[in-house]
UniProtKB/Swiss-Prot annotation:
Required cofactor(s): Zn(2+)
Composition skew (Basic and acidic residues), residue ranges: 867-885
Binding residue positions for ATP: 87, 105-109, 512
Organism: Aliivibrio salmonicida (strain LFI1238)
Name by which UniProt lists this protein: Protein translocase subunit SecA
Gene: secA
Length: 907
């Protein structure tokens, strides 16, 4: 109560921020006459002046008013477009590393030019991040003339660019690209073998367009670069045949309950598991197929791979639906992005799921993949010194932006008041009744000349509605993942009189729907249009625009509520741009996924008690509130999942930083001999301690074991026993020093025989190759660890703490093994000449090229992350080892009670 009164008196945080920024806008506006009087050359020269002032110690904040005034004036001269005051505020919010919530049609693309120009003055480069290639190219081409007029270079970063082109693009002052491509470039750079093969430079300032889509919706989908693993396509096919024989278990309190089924299905959590009955049934099927021994069970260690295949196949059949989660095109399964409705060619689900779906659909099964590198968007974008974003809908997720990314959200006022009429939801009993009502609404709008945009949640629903419209003989366009090649054209005409457009989810987002059609798109179709032709097109558009306004503007129909209120708001936001008339309404049914899974039974019971007849709808604020409460629950659950994913990934991220920093260091220096010498000292001291324990009696010394180990692992044939026999004063410390000195001496002789530069190159090559191999295995071990860590909860242990502890032990083991392997290889190898190094370098490059050719860029399935005490599906990533590698300081698994390094670790 008190906080509400205080807010009324002093204003909200948002109000206070806007008041402060309006004062700076006033300063910029006062500069306008001065900048209008400048000649073009004088305006262009401002960039050189600003850069010079930065070098002399002025800050970007000092330059901001003049820099923004420069961009506004250039835009007026080139495009005839003057930045509104609210766009100036938006630009300042972005420059302050905050999120600007700007409604659809308020000119986010033009707003971004302001902070991009200002921050590009530093020479460090600015990245403008978009959700797809089309928007990256469009925005780059739209703003290229403006930036180049002011002396800035503009680049585009899209998939499949040659490395040299990509490297050149990263040198641009302002670079437009997709979130995926920036992330994958980072991973690829950290797999490069030479410094000159890397394309990125420092990550200074990023402006993310549709920031909610990238930092919220896609936060659960890690970017993964993977290479091919072993071929097991036949096994997927054989197991796929078994799955349709399984029966789902009904809820015990449901009318259909027929006893224990073979698997459970949790639609809310998007999980499925075999029941005990199902496990026994599957085991019998596998035995009948000859895939399992008679006395075996699914959970015996030898059958872990079979269990992995069964779980993947079960998920493919039960959780993943054709034309909703994926489409089949050209004998390939192509993922459909659940957030945008777009297809993602080249992307593959990990952990065998994609192969299981391919087997289900009867298309060619491609090889499984093994993770070579991965990172989440959360951790990638936190690498930037400055991060900001724009979207039409961020306020509902403001808490998440602040808690995970440290980004405040500022709601920017519209340039003109919003006049859209958002009508209440209509709820029907069945989907058929709902679709009938939607058809009637579309008919009525079409007859009065009002354009309609219908939002659906899946390709399947969009095609169902399209067929119903065809039956009703209503002309319409479909905008979904199957037809996004014509996307821009369909969106350009979606605002024309009586146009009916069906859009899957938010396909077409990023392109404004202009009432009366897009006259600029019409002009673009002409070759060298004359001023008269342009004028004629504009006049025709003005007439069409006024006709549509009279009919009520764009009408939005939502066919289902989404899990997130934000996505519903995005759909509504397509209407009412820049103060235009518009309206929106959602049509729901009790058969919709959200209503069925999350909305309480009260709504359904209320409708039944009212004795509603077929075709009748209920419209009441209580119903709308119940639905919004259901959405809040889902949003809260999804936030918890994303937060948890980040907590687990932060552990891997700390390790990733260490490994990538080590790689950087290796690639940036020519001589790593000091590092090698330090490692040799550590390794030999550790080895010595295993066989001759500190401060121990000579009777406890294993001289023979030490001699053998030095000979086999380090090619050192030392007469240690003879030394001891001939010198009674050769104690433990002296003996250790003598062995280490001998090792250094042998290596020095090797250096003299092959040449210093040859050996330096060879050391670097061996270190890089060994590090990459161990890191790949470590990622597989971490995946394996994370998938079973939730079981620690049953032992009254905190899974997160256990994960941190064990992953740290794994990482310590990696660093120890790296030292040991590198020193061992360098000690044993015989480098004859420079050609040996070059041959190794060439082989390594060929291997890298082969991996690059075959590697898949994946989005790991979002739903198979873990929470603390609840199992996700038992999906086992392709493993390098069958078991977790035993750490050198752990107890030996043989049962001796000794440390592994002092027992079987010696072997």
């Amino acid at each position: 109560m008190f906080s509400k009164i205080l807010t009324k008196v002093i204003g909200s945080r948002n109000d206070r921020t806007l008041r402060k920024l309006r004062k700076i806008v006033d300063q910029i506006n006062k500069l306008e006459p001065q900048f209008e009087s400048l000649q073009d050359e004088e305006l262009k020269a401002k960039t050189i002046e600003f850069r010079s002032r930065l070098e002399q110690g002025e800050s970007l904040d000092d330059l901001l008013p003049e820099a923004f005034a420069t961009v506004r004036e250039a835009s007026k001269r080139l495009y005839g477009m003057r930045h509104f005051d609210v766009q100036m505020i938006g630009g300042m919010v972005l420059n302050d590393s905050q999120i600007a919530e700007m409604r659809t049609g308020e000119g986010k693309t033009l707003t971004a030019t302001l902070p991009c120009y200002l921050n590009a003055l530093t020479g460090k480069g600015v990245h403008v991040v978009t959700v797809n290639d089309y928007l990256a190219k469009r925005d780059a081409e739209t703003n290229r003339e403006l930036f180049e007029f002011l002396g800035m270079t503009v680049g585009i970063n899209v998939p499949n660019m040659p490395p040299q082109e990509k490297k050149l693009a990263y040198q641009s002052d302002i670079l437009y690209g997709t979130n995926n491509e920036f992330g994958f470039d980072y991973l690829r750079d950290n797999m490069a073998f030479r410094a000159e093969d890397r394309v990125q430079r420092e990550r200074y300032f990023a402006v993310i367009d549709e920031v909610d889509s990238i930092l919220i919706d896609e936060a659960r989908t890690p970017l993964i670069i993977s290479g091919p693993a072993d071929d097991s396509s036949e096994l997927y096919t054989r197991i796929n045949i078994l799955i349709p024989q399984l029966v789902k278990q009904d809820e015990e309190d449901s009318e259909d309950y027929r006893g224990e089924g073979h698997y459970t299905l949790d639609e809310k959590g998007k999980q499925t598991h075999l029941t005990e009955n199902g496990q026994e049934f599957v085991e019998q099927l596998l035995k009948d197929e000859g895939l399992m021994e008679e006395e075996d069970t699914l959970y015996s260690p030898a059958n872990i791979s079979l269990l992995h295949h069964i779980n993947a196949a079960l998920r493919a059949h039960v959780l993943f639906e054709k034309d909703v989660d994926y489409i089949v095109k050209d004998d390939e399964v192509i993922i459909v992005d659940e957030h945008t409705g777009r297809t993602m060619p080249g992307r593959r689900w990990s952990e065998g799921l994609h192969q299981a779906v391919e087997a289900k659909e009867g298309v060619k099964i491609q090889n499984e993949n093994q993770t070579l590198a991965s990172i989440t968007f959360q951790n990638f974008f936190r690498l930037y010194d400055k991060l900001s974003g724009m979207t039409g809908t961020a306020d509902t997720e403001a808490f998440e932006f602040q808690s995970i990314y440290g980004l405040d959200t500022v709601v920017i006022p519209t340039n003109r008041p919003m006049t859209r009429n958002d009508m209440g939801d209509l709820v029907y009993m069945t989907e058929a009744e709902k679709f009938a009502a939607i058809i009637e609404d579309i008919k009525a709008c079409s007859e009065r000349g009002q354009p309609v945009l219908v939002g659906t949640v899946s390709i399947e629903k969009s095609e169902l509605l399209s067929n119903a419209l065809k039956t009703a003989k209503i002309k319409h366009n479909v905008l979904n993942a199957k037809f996004h090649e014509q996307e821009a054209d369909i969106v350009a005409n979606a605002g024309t009189s009586s146009a009916v457009t069906i859009a899957t989810n938010m396909a077409g987002r990023g392109t404004d729907i202009v009432l009366g059609g897009n006259w600029q798109a019409e002009v673009a179709k002409l070759d060298n249009p004359s001023a008269e032709q342009v004028q004629t097109i504009k006049a025709a558009w003005k007439e069409a625009h006024d006709t549509v306004l009279t009919a009520g503007g764009l009408h939005i129909i939502g066919t289902e509520r989404h899990e997130s209120r934000r996505i519903d708001n995005q759909l509504r936001g397509r209407a009412g741009r820049q103060g235009d008339a518009g309206s929106s309404r959602f049509y729901l049914s009790m058969e919709d996924a959200l209503m069925r899974i999350f909305a309480s039974d009260r709504v359904s019971n209320m409708m039944k008690k009212l004795g509603m007849e077929e075709g009748e709808a209920i419209e009441h604020p209580w119903v709308t509130k119940a639905i919004e409460n259901a959405q809040r629950k889902v949003e809260g659950r999804n936030f918890d999942i994303r937060k948890q994913l980040l907590e687990y990934d932060d552990v891997a991220n700390d390790q990733r930083k260490v490994v990538y920093e080590l790689r950087d260091e290796l690639m940036n220096v020519d001589d790593i001999s000091e590092m090698i010498n330090h490692n040799r000292q550590d390794v030999l001291e550790g080895l010595f301690g295993q066989y001759i324990p500190p401060q121990s009696l000579e009777e406890m010394w294993d001289v023979e074991g030490l001699t053998t180990r030095l000979r086999t692992d380090f090619d050192l044939d030392l007469p240690i026993q003879e030394w001891l026999d001939s010198d009674n004063k050769l104690h433990e410390d002296n003996l250790r020093e003598k062995i280490i000195e001998s090792a250094f001496q042998v290596y020095k002789e090797k250096e003299e025989s092959v040449g210093e530069s040859v050996l330096r190159n060879f050391e670097k090559a061996v270190m890089l190759q060994t590090l990459d191999g161990l890191w790949k295995e470590h990622l597989a071990a971490m995946d394996h660890l994370r998938q079973g860590i939730h079981l620690r909860g049953y032992a009254q242990k905190n899974p997160k703490q256990e994960y941190k502890r064990e992953s740290f032990e794994l990482f310590e083991g990696l660093l120890d093994t790296l030292k040991l392997d590198v020193v061992s290889i360098l000690s044993k190898v015989r480098v004859q000449q420079q050609e040996d190094v070059e041959r190794m370098e060439e082989q390594r490059r060929k291997n890298a090229e082969e991996v690059a050719r075959l590697q898949k860029l994946q989005h790991q399935n979002a739903e198979n992350q873990l929470d603390d005490g609840h199992s996700s599906d038992q999906n086992h990533s392709p493993m390098v080892r069958d078991e977790r590698k035993v750490g050198r300081n752990e107890v030996c698994p043989c049962g001796s009670g000794k440390k592994y390094k002092q027992c079987h670790g010696k072997i």
